[in-house]
């Protein structure tokens, strides 16, 4: 059974209860309340319990190969005994041959592959560092307008590693969002803007991390032109497609369970922030989420969609409220917390 690791420096559980939370900037928002469920099917799915007798393994695990989500005494997606499931990013040690062939298992369980090609293959990191955590404390900063007037900047920059989403600006917002950036996690649309319009919010020391590299169209029309345009001045990495598929599988598994708990239907498509959270959980000893608050009709009256512009939010593609329910379940088996102006949610217990 997977046991939660304690966050260094935690003294106890936060007294803040069930605030209205949300996710980052990418698409839409929804609202619902969460209850502190302790022993439920979702926790069994996350922990990937493997009992020697009956009763410990949930029907979810019998129906799906969710044991790939667990390893050792940590919450992780990698399984060191199975090489096809052990990669988080694409690297030269898991992309083979002259054309950098990437092997993975698709969403239907079929073994498949694609070639990164010379342009992208040459910029891949040498080693994947599979199954290791490379950072201590980490912050993942979403783009919610609720970050305005939060004064979280210094707190965010105090983490060992910081990820930002879709190249969000930090200039003029230092007090609220900080400036430190270790990773820039981006979807293909923002990668395309980078190619077409340039990089306004250049952060030369950060790693640009993309999760849609398995598509040949994306590689030819977006990522290859991106690498050719910026060369070595832009550090680029790609999530391994097998890891992306496993993160999507986990979304679907938890969605089925949480829909039953909440008696509510959620959208099928994960937002980019879902993959960002799952990546950081593989690379960090602990993770704090900032700007992850649901954009709803109620929230619209109190804060803009983004902290850096006046774009109008939409509510028809993703279920950000579901993502928060899932993150709160993650927090029961991994040192993950969600920051709000009123306090912390999901703080690790003693």
Q: Where is each model-derived feature located?
A:
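Metal-ion/cofactor- or nucleotide/acyl-coenzyme-handling active-site neighborhoods
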Residues: 18-19, 41-42, 46-350
């Amino acid at each position: 059974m997977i046991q939660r690791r304690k966050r260094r420096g935690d003294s106890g559980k936060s007294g803040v209860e069930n605030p209205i939370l949300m996710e980052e900037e990418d698409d839409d928002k929804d609202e619902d309340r969460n209850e502190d469920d302790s022993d439920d099917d979702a926790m069994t799915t996350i922990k990937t319990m493997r009992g020697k007798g009956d009763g410990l393994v949930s029907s979810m695990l019998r129906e799906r190969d969710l044991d790939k989500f667990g390893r050792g005494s940590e919450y992780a997606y990698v399984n060191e005994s199975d090489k096809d499931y052990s990669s988080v990013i694409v690297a030269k040690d898991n992309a083979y041959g002259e054309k950098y062939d990437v092997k993975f298992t698709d969403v239907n369980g079929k073994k498949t592959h694609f070639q990164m090609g010379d342009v992208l293959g040459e910029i891949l990191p040498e080693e994947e560092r599979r199954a290791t955590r490379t950072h201590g404390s980490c912050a993942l900063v979403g783009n919610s307008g609720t970050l305005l007037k939060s004064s979280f900047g210094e707190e965010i920059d105090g983490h060992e590693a910081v990820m930002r989403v879709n190249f969000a600006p930090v200039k003029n917002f230092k007090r609220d969002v900080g400036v430190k950036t270790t990773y820039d996690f981006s979807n293909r649309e923002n990668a395309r803007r980078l190619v077409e319009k340039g990089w306004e919010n250049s952060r030369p020391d950060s790693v640009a991390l993309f999760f849609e590299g398995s598509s040949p169209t994306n590689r030819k029309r977006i990522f290859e032109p991106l690498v050719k345009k910026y060369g070595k001045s832009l550090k680029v990495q790609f999530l391994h497609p097998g890891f992306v598929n496993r993160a999507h599988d986990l979304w679907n598994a938890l969605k089925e369970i949480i829909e039953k708990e909440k008696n509510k239907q959620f959208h099928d498509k994960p937002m980019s922030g879902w993959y960002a959270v799952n990546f950081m959980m593989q690379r960090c000893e602990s993770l704090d989420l900032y700007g992850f608050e649901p954009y709803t009709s109620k929230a619209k009256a109190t804060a803009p969609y983004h902290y850096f512009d006046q774009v109008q939010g939409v509510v028809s593609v993703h279920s950000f409220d579901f993502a928060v329910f899932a993150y709160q379940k993650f927090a029961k088996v991994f040192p993950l917390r969600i920051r709000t102006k009123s306090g912390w949610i999901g703080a690790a217990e003693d």
